[in-house]
Amino acid sequence: MFYEIMHRESCVAQLSTTGECRVCLEDFMPYDLVLVESDDFDERINNVTNFYYWCASRMLTLDRTYAKEILNSIGASQSVTDRERAQIALSYHCLSLLDVFWVKEENEKIRFEDINLFAHSLSNALVDIALRGHQMTVTNAHLLANDLSTGGLYPKAWVRKEDGFYLYKDGGREAVEREVLASKICRCFDCHQVLYEQGMFENEPVSISKIMTSQRYSLVTYAAYDVYCTNHDWNTLDKILELDAPGYYMMNILDYLVGNTDRHWENWGLLVDNETNQPIRLHDLMDFNRAFQQYDTPEGANCLTVGKRHLSQKDAAVEAVRNIGLNQVRQVEHTVFSEHPAWKATFEERLRVLRDAM
C-alpha cells in the first residue's frame, strides 16, 4: 500500500509500507520528515521508521495529563508504540491545526478543502476531554488531531468560535496566572507575541489565546527546523539569526525579564508561508505558564536557546540588548504585580540590568 503525503491539495511524496519512496515536491516536504529514494534495504526501513515517527508526532503525547482518557475516548490502546500512534493519526489523515500537511492512501478520493480543520468544526466534546479528563464518546474522532497535542505537559485544547480557533490551557490557577501576567508585561515590548487572557472553563481558570496558524501560515518548531538544517549541513542558529535576528533576541530578552525557564525546542520556531513552504520569521512568542521561576536572583536560569554555548538567561539577554536594544514601547503598570510584590522587585532589577547594558 502507498501513502501520499499531502501539502494542501498537492502530493509532495509517496511512500509504500515497505519503504519504497518517491519525492514529488522536495521544496514542500515537512521540515522534520526525511525520506530517501533508494533501493537499499536499510534506507527503506529508515523511510518507514521516519514516516511512522512523523505521523506519531501528530498524535497526542502519552505523558500528557489526561492523555489516557483521550485515548480511551477514541478506542485506542493505553500503551501504544510509534506505529500504533501513527495508525491513530492516520485514521484522521494526520490533520493538524499547526500546518497544512496531511496523509491519504493512494487513489483515495478526498480533498483537503473537504476535511481541513481550519474550515471544519471540531467537536465540543474534544474540548471537554482534553481539559477536564472526562470519559465520553467522541462521535467525530476523525477530527481529533495534533491540535490536542500542541506540546508540553499542560492540558490544552482548541475551541472554535465565530472568529476562529482559540487555545484554552489548563494546568491550575498558578500556571494560568503566571502566563497571563507574563503576557501583560511582554505587551510593553515590540515583539511578535501571542496574547494571553484569563478565562474560565467549568469553573476552573484557563489562559486563552487566538490561533496563530491558518491555511496561509504554518508553524514549524525549532526541533523540526533543526532536523531540516542538520540534513543540509547548516548551523540551525545561524540560519535563524539570518532569518529573524530581532525576533530571536527579543525572545531571550523577554524570557529573562519574566523568568520563563521553559523555552524548550518545541515551543519556539518558525512561521512558514504555505504558498512557498519557506520561513518568513520566527513565529509569535508563546508559552509562559512556567514564568517567574528561578526569579529570586538577577542571573536567572540557564538559557536554553543558545545552542551549545553555556549562558545564563541574564547573559543571553544582555547579549540581545547590545545587538538590538530593549525595544520597550511603554511602561509596565505597577498594578500588574499587585499580588506579587517580590516579582515586581525582581522584574525591576532585571530591567535595570538590561538598561545599564545598552
For every predicted segment, state its role:
Residues 264, 269-272:
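Conserved protein-kinase catalytic-loop segment immediately C-terminal to the catalytic Asp
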